[in-house]
Amino acid sequence: MSLWISGIPIHYYLILAMIIFTIGVAGVMVRRSAVLIFMSVELILNSVNLVFVTFSKALYQVDGEVVVFFVMAIAAAEAAIGLAIVIAIHRIKKTSYVDEMNLMKW
């Protein structure tokens, strides 16, 4: 196993992925806007993609890079469906804050 990828130690990539993941989790926990929560979820998914690509390159395997393509496709579909739902709720409730979205009461 190579501990260097393109002249950069592997743990730098993992630390960067951990920082991005932490920022994403903090964004999900703190933000109230549904759009910003979706952006934070995308950060989390991209940090996982970075880990997949890092280990794929370090172990000279293609499996991690193939998984990244599937994760990116699923993330794009999730973002499109999620934003469509947020837009539909925004038209009804006139807000995109998740605290004020209560669909049980119209």
Swiss-Prot record:
Pfam families: Oxidored_q2. GO terms for molecular function: NADH:ubiquinone reductase (non-electrogenic) activity; quinone binding. The chain crosses the membrane at residues 10-30, 35-55, 67-87. It is found in: Cell inner membrane. InterPro entries: NADH_UbQ_OxRdtase_chain4L/K, NUOK/Mnh_C1-like. Gene3D superfamilies: 1.10.287.3510. It catalyses: a quinone + NADH + 5 H(+)(in) = a quinol + NAD(+) + 4 H(+)(out). GO terms for cellular component: NADH dehydrogenase complex; plasma membrane. This is NADH-quinone oxidoreductase subunit K. The lineage of its organism: Bacteria, Pseudomonadati, Spirochaetota, Spirochaetia, Leptospirales. The gene is nuoK.
